[in-house]
Amino acid sequence: MDETQGPLAMTVHLLANSGHGSLLQRTLDQLLDCICPEVRLFQVSERASPVKYCEKSHSKRSRFPGMSVLLFLHESPGEDRLFRVLDSLQHSPWQCYPTQDTRGRLCPYFFANQEFYSLDSQLPIWGVRQVHCGSEILRVTLYCSFDNYEDAIRLYEMILQREATLQKSNFCFFVLYASKSFALQLSLKQLPPGMSVDPKESSVLQFKVQEIGQLVPLLPNPCMPISSTRWQTQDYDGNKILLQVQLNPELGVKNGILGAGMLPLGSRLTSVSAKRTSEPRSQRNQGKRSQGHSLELPEPSGSPTSDRCAGTSWKSPGRSFQVSSPAMGAHLHLSSHHLESGARMKVLNRENSFQKLEAETNVDTGLTIINSEPRQTYFGGFPRDLQTSQPPFCLPASSLGVATSKNNSVLKERVSPLPLAGQRDLGTRKTISECLLHLQVQGEEKEEDEEEFFI
């Protein structure tokens, strides 16, 4: 298999109740360290408050778990790794996932020889399978309802900017990471007609994207910002999705500005989905789809706001169709200029900026995620706008001015006279300071000409 390495385009955020994050992270680390220690796919965050889920009635329709994680492992002579993994899944805190109903009948779409395990009813189910040839695989599978399968393929091709590998008529996958002996995949599986999907509310898929302005109007459900670099939406079956905008200071790639050799996002989206039908089924059934839910943003005091289900952390957005309307294209285009100005300021300190972009943070509270040894611990937090009680639908230009004044004070301190012992480097430091001030003045002039924009 061809090697596909580098930063992961997808991570899976698992939301645990308060006080249970460390245990969940350690449990996953112990399970995965012997399989793929070089890949950190799962990030654990703790909720601000316990969650109570509302059960939905589906009028005698079977529901299948929306997400699973399957480990395809070798069993070489003299090695007991496969049995050690199975043994871990059969002990606390893991629980065997029931594949039979209350009458003892096998649930649809489960095979008699398959066993699944789970840590919580709202977390993915896990399974282990033995393979005799090829590389070992960790596969995250999203189960799609029969009518949504083709649309889901187009959606994830558009987000990942790569074509899916079609293995069967009802199964496809994306290779996210590959080495000579291991592969990480995201797969889509079509369910039989009449079977609905049970989305896992405590599981959130996060994807890294280069540009958000052109992507938002093409999404099937409302997409709203929850921080300066993260936007939230959901797929056709209700799986929560986070889109993290990548601003790479090392390559000079800003939001809306592409580096050499990179195609515009619009052309890439067209080329990837050109083989699919021009009119998605979702547009024909738009009225039948449920509205998207939004991550609950805690109040400044720390207490979460209430919503339609007591204690639940997802709620329906008040302005569901404003974000994805055609008129929003111009406003989203303006937002890319402001993000571009913010990216220019981050060039002043590349190391700090890079750490902020790479840091994984709590998608529910905005605090640092729970990490356990021996993996590296990240101390970056969510941008502070996640701590506000309302989503940042409106971002006035004056807010950028506040940041500008703060940066001016920092630059003035850098240009202050040096002590006598450091006068030998005065010429060099003056040159650097003048360059920084020149960049800052350009940012101020651009901001004065722009009006406030709305997302």
From Swiss-Prot:
One of its GO terms (cellular component) is nucleoplasm. It is found in: Nucleus. Residues 270-322 are annotated as: Disordered. Keywords: Nucleus, Phosphoprotein. The modification Phosphoserine is found at S49. It comes from the Eukaryota. The keyword Nucleus applies. Residues 313-322 have a biased composition (Polar residues). Interacts with CHD7 and CHD8. Belongs to the FAM124 family. This is Protein FAM124B. It comes from Homo sapiens (Human).
